[in-house]
Structure formats: C-alpha cells, structure tokens
From Swiss-Prot:
It comes from the Eukaryota. It is a multi-pass membrane protein. The gene is mt:CoII. Its cofactor is Cu cation. It is found in: Mitochondrion inner membrane. Keywords: Copper, Electron transport, Magnesium, Membrane, Metal-binding, Mitochondrion, Mitochondrion inner membrane, Respiratory chain, Translocase, Transmembrane, Transmembrane helix, Transport. The chain crosses the membrane at residues 27-48, 63-82. GO terms for molecular function: copper ion binding; cytochrome-c oxidase activity. CDD domains: CcO_II_C (cd13912). Component of the cytochrome c oxidase, the last enzyme in the mitochondrial electron transport chain which drives oxidative phosphorylation. The respiratory chain contains 3 multisubunit complexes succinate dehydrogenase (complex II, CII), ubiquinol-cytochrome c oxidoreductase (cytochrome b-c1 complex, complex III, CIII) and cytochrome c oxidase (complex IV, CIV), that cooperate to transfer electrons derived from NADH and succinate to molecular oxygen, creating an electrochemical gradient over the inner membrane that drives transmembrane transport and the ATP synthase. Binds a dinuclear copper A center per subunit. This is Cytochrome c oxidase subunit 2.
Length: 228
C-alpha cells in the first residue's frame, strides 16, 4: 500500500504490475532524455551570438527532427502494445471471483463454490482497531490463493464503479448491466489495499477493497469453513 512520502509506485505483487513498473521507468527515461535535449537546444538558441538572416530552410535538420521522433515513438509504442495485449489476455483461471459495486460498498461471490457470498463495508474510524488503517480496512476481506490464476468479473448494481488494486495492476470498471473481466496472479502473501476509482456519489471515498493473499492450503481451509 502507499505510505507517507512515497514518491514511486506501490511494490508489485503480480508479474503484470512488475512489467507495468518497468514500462513506466522505460518511458520516464526517454522523457528525461527528451527534456534535457530540448532544454539544451533552447539554452543554446537564446544565449548565442550567431544570427543568419538568409537561412530559409535546412533539409538535413528537418529530416532529423522528423525521423528521430518517429524512432522514439516506436521505442515507446512497441512495449506499450505488448503490455496491452498481456493485460487483456485471460488464462485458464483457478478461481473466479465476482465483484458487484454498490453505493457505497462491494459485494463478492465465489462462483466456483456454493453459498459463498458476502458484502464488504469500510470499518468506520470509531470502530477501527489500533493497528487498522483509516478509510482502508473492511469488515470482510477478499481471501484469494497466491500463485494461482484469478479471474475477476466486475459489474455494478446502481452507478458506474471501478474495482482497483494498484499493487496487482488491476483496474476494472463496474458498469450496470454489463460484465467486465480481467485476470491477475498474486505472487506473494499479504494484504493488498485498493479503492473505488470512479466517482460514484457522496461516499465514493468510503468503499475500499482489501485482498488477503494466502497459500493454497489455507484458502482451501477457508473455503471449507465458509461452505459448512
């Protein structure tokens, strides 16, 4: 989760989020290089004493400033397209989770198992434990197995919501009457926090998401205890 004075992205907990961070750093490096080059050229333009009143065109420089940006755009576009297709790919899931957005809480259904569904509300500040996180903790966490392909189906019951967990690189809009899906792979145990990322009304800020990633054997025990 994000902490105080955190200037970077959250630590990744999935392979796709790791790739997104690499692409962010790659694009940022290119932007810094462009900024330095343009800044240097502007400095040299403003602070030199050379003026040529008869220079009408420069074919070589025009070719350079046409071809060079095209090459730079290719270096950004190709990794971006690769990531776009990777994020859109749905692998054979081990577990399917359905998330339904409401004003202002989430409902969850484990589609592969019988009778496992619950609502997840934010814990109010006056009911929060001393080790809890204000405006982020919920009464019912989503329990998912680590090192397994997870598919999530997202929809909404009233207005548009957005199910977002930054550490997993997941952001899916929940639209009434429509079912959106994506998949992710959690590669370590822990708690991962997210929030609704689509303005959905007065209490939009108060519908957090908490995922508890556990080993597969603990997940099976949790499923068995909730099925009985």
């Amino acid at each position: 989760m994000s902490t105080w004075a955190n200037l970077g992205l959250q630590d990744s907990a999935s392979p796709l989020m790791e790739q997104l961070i690499f692409f962010h750093d790659h694009a940022l490096l290119i932007l810094v290089m462009i900024t330095v080059l343009v800044g240097y050229l502007m400095f040299m333009l403003f602070f030199n004493n050379y003026v040529n009143r008869f220079l009408l065109h420069g074919q070589l420089i025009e070719m350079i400033w046409t071809i060079l940006p095209a090459i730079i755009l290719l270096f950004i576009a190709l990794p971006s397209l690769r990531l776009l297709y990777l994020l859109d790919e749905i692998n054979e899931p081990s577990v399917t989770l359905k998330s339904i957005g409401h004003q202002w809480y989430w409902s969850y259904e484990y589609s592969d198992f019988n009778n496992i569904e619950f609502d997840s509300y934010m814990i109010p500040t006056n009911e929060l434990m001393t080790d809890g996180f204000r405006l982020l903790d919920v009464d019912n966490r989503v329990v998912l197995p680590m090192n397994s392909q997870i598919r999530i189906l997202v929809t909404a019951a009233d207005v548009i919501h957005s199910w977002t967990v930054p550490a997993l690189g997941v952001k899916v809009d929940g639209t009434p009457g429509r079912l959106n899906q994506t998949n992710f792979f959690i590669n370590r145990p822990g708690l991962f926090y997210g929030q609704c990322s689509e303005i959905c009304g007065a209490n939009h800020s108060f519908m957090p998401i908490v995922i508890e990633s556990v080993p597969v054997n603990y997940f099976i025990k949790w499923i068995s205890s909730n099925n009985s």
